[in-house]
């Protein structure tokens, strides 16, 4: 099992995997949901630029997208924001991930977060924080298994840091 960074050459298999993830799910946004394949190809180019901190719209930060691949099969998506903003501190942190519906409940969420944490450290991201909707017990468990420490909460979210 491995993480593969998004490439402008990614094709149909990645597109189909992303179609197995809802548009918004547990606060994870899948912008590819509802896109045509041609739109997906254009989105890849934009995301590749963002990973290089180029052409980022105001109010956004650079992010790098990775695919979780198991035996050449795309399983899930992970996003690493290069830095935290006030908005992302409250609403998402700097790592987000989702597993395609047909692969859930098999430990892939735990694995993708483990690999994303290593990648974030390799990228020299100093502060790693995740937020979780309070009803999303599966993601809470994944974060705790990977060493996340609860440091705050409110009526809607749990806030975790990795030290």
Please identify what each model-predicted range represents.
Residues 1-94, 155-163:
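GNAT-family acyltransferases
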Residues 2, 96, 129-131:
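Short aromatic/hydrophobic contact patches that present stacked aromatics
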Residues 20, 81, 106-123, 155-156, ...:
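Extended, folded domain segments that form the structural surfaces/walls around functional sites
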Residues 83-85, 102, 135:
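Short coil/turn motifs at secondary-structure junctions
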Residues 96-99, 105-118, 140-145:
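Conserved acetyl-CoA-binding loop-helix of GNAT-fold acetyltransferases
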Residues 121-131:
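Conserved GNAT acetyl-CoA-binding A-motif
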Residues 130-138:
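Conserved beta-strand-loop-alpha-helix junction that forms the acyl-donor binding cleft
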Residues 131, 144-162:
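Conserved catalytic-core motifs of GNAT/GCN5-like acyltransferases
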